[in-house]
């Protein structure tokens, strides 16, 4: 069972009055997120790397873990915001603890459980456990006996790892996402309704797909929103026009084009490694 954020039911942004105030949140988001940003050389020294797992292998396992938690989330009909928060928790966890000692499915399930609390999209533990069983067995119709060993195994895994996850995250529940910022940017720079809708859809898929990578640990939500806009405009052939004459749009929002292109290239790496899981989004390298 393959998971593609590009084809998920949660591709389109939710209509939320709070989006109108996104511009006021951008500075706070950038400042708040800084403590969880890591430099490239730090990914060569993760706990998993110290346990003898090459980062190339760790990246693959991280991607599988996020795919698992996303499938569980779709079974539970969770909004994309909750899934992104769960994925961010997942990636942060493995900057503190080794993937060799803590299986990515176990932590993925726990991240879903905790993210539903943090985002106030609560689901019953029973329903989360049943969804984990079905996704793990690759059987959407699987009948789960609540007294079965499999049911109790997943239930115990989630409850046991919840405290471990909380400690690894330093009880930091404020996890900003790029979605509201992205909507603000598309409204700011793309005035044509048809182009804006197409661009928003593609850029939204970029953010969804980026959850399978470590981009949330490398760049702030503001940079990721800008990268999504840049990549989406390339895919949709939509011109993004700055409001101020003589400046590029990324200069107006004070985001480095070097960072934007680096984020796009990380997504190109993901596409090249698993194109069958990327839906219609074809991420290409930016020189």
PLM regions: where:
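Acidic, Ser/Thr/Pro-rich regulatory low-complexity segments at or just upstream of the first helical elements
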Residues: 1-102, 114-141, 147, 159-164
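C-terminal region detector
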Residues: 3-11, 211-226, 231-287
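Intrinsic disorder
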Residues: 56-63, 77-80, 84, 98-105, ...
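Surface-exposed interaction/gating patches
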Residues: 72, 118, 152-241
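Eukaryotic basic, amphipathic alpha-helical target segments in cytosolic regions
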Residues: 94-98, 119-122, 136, 169, ...
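Short amphipathic alpha-helical segments embedded in low-complexity Lys/Glu-rich regions
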Residues: 102-107, 127-132, 145, 178-184, ...
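Charged, alpha-helix-forming regions
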Residues: 118-119, 125-147, 152-156, 240, ...
């Amino acid at each position: 069972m393959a998971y593609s954020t590009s084809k998920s039911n949660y591709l389109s942004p939710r209509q939320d009055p709070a989006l109108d105030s996104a511009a006021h949140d951008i500075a706070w988001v950038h400042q708040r997120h800084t403590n969880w940003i890591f430099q490239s050389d730090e990914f060569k020294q993760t706990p998993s790397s110290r346990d003898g797992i090459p980062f190339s292998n760790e990246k693959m396992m991280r991607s599988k873990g996020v795919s698992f938690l996303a499938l569980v989330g779709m079974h539970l009909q969770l909004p994309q915001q909750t899934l992104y928060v769960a994925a961010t928790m997942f990636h942060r966890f493995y900057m503190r603890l080794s993937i060799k000692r803590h299986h990515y499915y176990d932590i993925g399930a726990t991240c879903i459980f905790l993210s539903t609390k943090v985002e106030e999209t609560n689901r019953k533990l029973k329903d989360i456990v049943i969804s984990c069983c079905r996704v793990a067995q690759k059987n959407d119709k699987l009948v789960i006996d609540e007294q079965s060993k499999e049911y109790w195994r997943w239930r115990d895994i989630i409850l046991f790892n919840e405290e471990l996850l909380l400690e690894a995250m330093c009880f930091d529940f404020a996890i900003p996402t790029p979605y509201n910022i992205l909507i603000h940017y598309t409204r700011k720079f793309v005035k044509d309704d048809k182009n804006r809708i197409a661009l928003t859809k593609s850029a939204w898929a970029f953010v969804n797909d980026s959850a399978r990578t470590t981009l949330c640990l490398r760049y702030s939500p503001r940079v990721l929103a800008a990268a999504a806009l840049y990549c989406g405009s390339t895919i949709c052939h939509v011109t993004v026009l700055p409001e101020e004459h003589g400046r590029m749009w990324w200069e107006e929002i004070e985001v480095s084009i070097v960072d934007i292109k680096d984020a796009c290239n990380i997504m190109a790496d993901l596409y090249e490694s698993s194109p069958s899981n990327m839906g219609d989004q074809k991420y290409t390298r930016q020189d």
